[in-house]
């Protein structure tokens, strides 16, 4: 038997709500999942019998949740216990304090991770301000001689402030972040391989609106980043002007990131233009990761005509290698269009197009015509639907068609990576109201052609479902399917399947579910007189879950009791 332990966090609500919370609630659940599987083709890829049992117990004390759980599956045992990690956020009038593992709203280019420390926010109708200090990242300091040693990392501290103002559709926010690694937080043997870092980030975010139809939003940031805090310091007068908050070293660099959006909103029409620019090697130690070394320009527009026709389209282009230091420059263009027509209250037709174009240009090296990356992707879709409601029956018919082409545009290409796919589908749903039963019939066909290869698949299925009993707590469903697959000049296969399921809920605490599936499949060849459709798979499942409340001390009952005692004393 193998044992392993996991950590489950302890959660806490706003401290201002603790007095209103229930003093003690003990809840839990017990359950089991069981699967039996048999295949005439062998059991090499799945165990014939899989059993699991689990139990959960949660102690909630004045809003603090401490979960315990145990899980047993065949020969594996897992036990999880709570780790005390607090997050208190008391509020008083316009102030909110943060204690423990917390997060605060900052610019995405400045800070998007949580911190373990203290913070304070102040907000009124127009003005706002915040500040925090804490640990942004824990140290990883394993023994270097351990064969399973993790990648080391320093403990990272950070502090930041923000201030903002907003009125109507106009706003402005200023952000400041200072982050640095603690050199003594890892073993000396690691320090030659991993160097401590330091960062100073200044961000500005704002929005301007004109008469509710024209808006301009911008989000920019400048980052001063040092890759090695122990590298030699730059001693020039200009570099030492900001020594009190950031020491400029020979491993320091200054980078910029930002985006802007101009939007137009009119009656029945909207449009926007978007631009983003992130310099190479832009880093903020307050973010998990920021993609850099690219710029993007995008356009989008949409309108509604005659209250029936909805049109939308968008285009965006992206290019990397801004510093021209990569071997090659990659450009990508994404474009799409959509039209939806409501022919009547019962019928609707939607058509869509999506495209992508990728090309490669010169960088420090010149692109070779024979190996140049130049691809295009086209995708066309058409989806008509028809609904016919009635007193006894509801009918829904849906059709779908999609064609996708992925093609190499290199003039020396012979089409080895070209792929064309055609997918067709049809479904009919019948709702029999007197029986409270649904029936669904569906057909689908897919054909994919590649270089000297072709694959096709045809699927037909019938399914039904119904709920029983007065409370509708017994649900059943059944599906019968037929699937034919063919790889041209290689293989043909046919499979037939039946799936049955039932679920029952008893008194809202006990949940039972049963499932059974049977499939028969094998290779078939229509040119031969005999097929090999003799493989069978059988799967049976049984699941059970019991949820309970072991103990509950209610705050409301306690308050009523105190009021009753006070009233009796008064009398």
Region locations from a protein language model:
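Outer-membrane beta-barrel proteins
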Residues: 104-110, 150-152, 189-197, 248-250
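Internal, well-ordered domain-core segments that constitute the primary functional module
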Residues: 114-193
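Transmembrane beta-strand segments of Gram-negative outer membrane beta-barrel proteins
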Residues: 14-41, 47-48, 59-68, 90, ...
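Outer membrane beta-barrel
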Residues: 71-136, 264-270, 277-280
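Bacterial N-terminal signal peptides
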Residues: 1-6
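Sec/Tat signal peptide C-region and signal peptidase I cleavage site
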Residues: 7-12
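Exposed, low-structure sequence patches enriched in small/polar residues
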Residues: 42-54, 81, 163-165, 172-184, ...
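Transmembrane beta-barrel domains of Gram-negative outer membranes and organellar outer membranes
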Residues: 41-94, 104, 336, 340, ...
């Amino acid at each position: 038997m193998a044992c392993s332990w996991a950590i489950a966090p302890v959660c806490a609500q706003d401290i201002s709500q603790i007095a209103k919370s229930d003093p003690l609630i003990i809840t839990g659940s017990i359950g089991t999942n069981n699967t039996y599987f048999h295949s005439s083709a062998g059991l090499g890829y799945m165990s014939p019998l899989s059993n699991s049992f689990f139990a959960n117990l949660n102690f909630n004390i004045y809003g603090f949740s401490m979960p315990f759980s145990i899980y047993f599956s065949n020969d594996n045992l897992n036990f999880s216990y709570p780790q005390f990690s607090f997050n208190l956020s008391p509020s008083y009038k316009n102030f909110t304090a943060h204690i423990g593992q917390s997060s605060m709203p900052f610019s995405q280019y400045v800070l998007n991770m949580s911190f373990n420390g203290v913070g304070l926010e102040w907000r009124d109708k127009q003005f706002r301000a915040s500040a925090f200090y804490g640990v942004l990242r824990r140290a990883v300091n394993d023994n270097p001689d351990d064969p399973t040693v993790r990648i080391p990392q320093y403990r990272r501290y950070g502090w930041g402030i923000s201030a903002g103002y907003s009125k109507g559709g106009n706003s402005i926010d200023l952000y400041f972040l200072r982050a640095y690694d603690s050199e003594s937080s890892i073993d000396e043997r690691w320090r030659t391989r991993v160097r401590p870092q330091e960062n100073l980030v200044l961000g500005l975010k704002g929005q301007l609106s004109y008469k509710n139809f024209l808006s301009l939003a911008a989000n920019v940031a400048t980052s001063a980043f040092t890759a090695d805090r122990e590298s030699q310091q730059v001693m020039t007068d200009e570099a030492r002007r900001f020594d009190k908050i950031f020491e400029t070293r020979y491993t320091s660099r200054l980078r910029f990131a930002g985006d802007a959006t101009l939007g137009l909103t009119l009656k029945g029409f909207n449009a926007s233009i978007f631009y983003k620019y992130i310099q190479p090697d832009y880093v903020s130690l307050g973010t998990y990761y920021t993609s850099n070394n690219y710029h993007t320009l995008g356009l989008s527009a949409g309108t509604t005509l005659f209250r029936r026709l909805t049109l939308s389209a968008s285009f965006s282009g992206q290019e990397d290698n801004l510093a021209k230091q990569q071997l090659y420059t990659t450009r990508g263009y994404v474009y799409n269009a959509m039209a939806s027509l409501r022919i009547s209250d019962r019928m609707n037709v939607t058509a869509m197009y999506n495209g992508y174009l990728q090309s490669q240009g010169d960088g420090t090296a010149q692109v070779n015509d024979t190996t140049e990356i130049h691809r295009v992707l086209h995708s066309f879709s058409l989806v008509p639907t028809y609904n016919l409601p009635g007193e006894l029956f509801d009918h829904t018919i849906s059709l779908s068609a999609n064609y996708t082409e992925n093609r190499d545009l290199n003039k020396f290409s012979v089409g080895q990576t070209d792929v064309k796919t055609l997918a067709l589908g049809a479904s009919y749903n019948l709702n029999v109201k007197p029986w409270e039963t649904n029936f669904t019939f569906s057909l689908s066909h897919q054909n994919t052609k590649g270089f000297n290869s072709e694959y096709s698949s045809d699927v037909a299925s019938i399914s039904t479902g119904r709920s029983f009993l007065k409370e509708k707590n017994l649900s059943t469903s059944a599906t019968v399917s037929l699937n034919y697959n063919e790889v041209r000049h290689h293989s043909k296969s046919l499979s037939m399947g039946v799936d049955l399921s039932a679920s029952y809920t008893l008194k809202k605490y006990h949940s039972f579910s049963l499932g059974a599936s049977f499939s028969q499949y094998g290779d078939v060849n229509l040119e031969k007189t005999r097929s090999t459709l003799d493989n069978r798979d059988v799967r049976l499942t049984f699941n059970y879950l019991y949820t309970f409340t072991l103990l509950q001390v209610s705050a409301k009952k306690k308050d009523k009791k105190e009021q009753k005692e006070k009233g009796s004393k008064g009398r």
